[in-house]
Amino acid sequence: MKTNAEDLFETLLQDKNLGLSIGNDEALEYDRISFGIPQLDNITNGGIPKKRFTLIYGGWSSGKSYLCTKLCESVQKENGTVLWVDTEQSWDSEWMTQCGLDTNKVLLKIPENAEDAYNTMAAGMEKGVDIVVLD
């Protein structure tokens, strides 16, 4: 005999207007972008999901930009396109190169304001850029 919760679960799942799926549905598994750091890839199930928003959060000088360079390096190794939106105006081409990034193949935007940053990111995503970094 089904419980009320089980009945509700089935009813909601079958309602096509809601577009629900089961949380362990294989269709929800995404391709990933590797960090290129085996230990980090291991704990993140292979990196960050492609075509999804991912926030890397941490204190000042904690390695956030470095992790983003490693993700971008992985994208470049697969001949993907990188868009880097530098809101901090801290782009350092020499340091990025030392981290493994081919800066000759990075689309760089230093936006004038938040709207400019947003419009650049939206255009990049719409055109099919493989990774967008907002730094």
Regions found by a protein language model. Give the residues of each.
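The Walker A/P-loop phosphate-binding site
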Residues: 2-109, 117-126
